[in-house]
Amino acid sequence: MRLVDGAAAVLAEANGRGIPVIVVTNQSGIGRGLFGWKELVAVEERIEAELAALGARVDAVLACPFHSEGRAPFRHPDHPARKPNAGLLLRAAEAFTLDLGSSWIVGDRAGDVAAGRAAGLAGGMHVATGWGSQPGEREAARACAGNGYRVLEAASIAEGPDLLPLLGECAGGNGR
């Protein structure tokens, strides 16, 4: 595990602006028995420590273990919390009193961007790191744009500072 170059700086900037940083992640590995919650927590704690050393933080991590090929009790053909469904984003909005219409999602999969649209977010930023560089991902993310939902493209989250002014603009300056 390694942080994407520039990620901590973007998160620190968001933290400084009062913009909640919430990770919503599909974790089918838990559902399929490849690893457990304990291992996921260990990885998240390591990320938290690395970010803290760089002056940044994540406010919450919401994970979905459900998968169509998961083992009981995590086997589900289309769980509402699993992206591209909106469930995790709706839970985050409830827990943090977020205005979804002023919120954005950043992700490396078209399903992340699609989840943002399904939840009624203002937009999504598709990054080409991780899965984002796979054939068809960028095009599928672009296809989510429309009806007021904006899709931006970036090489990595390091370009995220370009997104931060949009958050303030959408939210009347409060960044939520």
Language-model region placement:
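Short, charge-patterned binding micro-sites
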Residues: 25-32, 64-70
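Short secondary-structure boundary segments
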Residues: 1-14, 57-60, 64-72
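Short beta-strand segments at enzyme active-site cores
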Residues: 20-26, 59-64, 126
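Asp-based, Mg2+/Mn2+-dependent phosphohydrolase catalytic module
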Residues: 37-60, 68-105, 109-176
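Short, acidic loop-to-helix structural element flanking the phosphoryl-transfer center
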Residues: 1-22, 30-45, 80-90
